[in-house]
Amino acid sequence: MLFALTRKDRTMLKYIIPLEPRTKKNSQQIITVHGRPIIIPSSVYKKYEKEAMHFIEPPKTPIEAPVNVQAIFYMATRRRVDLNNLLECVTDVLVNAKVLADDNSNIVVGHDGSRVYYDKESPRTEIYITEIKDE
């Protein structure tokens, strides 16, 4: 779901992904190709990424301006999670969905306000993308 808002000369996009948040690094597989080990995302993560993209409507052109990507994660259980790994998953999904041109530090300049909460009834991820204006 996409919501476009404008506040005080700042454009903001809001996405809601009504799926249990997943991390890329905690669900990896090691396979061997020509005798060399290679780490790939698990089928659980690939499924999450594919399903999450159904809830993301990209803008006409990917964002190339500096933005803050705030993500609020609502987990189904109270187990400990790594916020950095969750944020990496979000930015990867946004790049693959062509919302962001890239997830480098020239475009995603911060994750200010990102948090992890508990909501057993409705696990989800709320993503707020706010344009950063140079003062």
Labelled PLM ranges:
Residues L2-E135:
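Acidic, proline/glycine-enriched N-terminal capping motif
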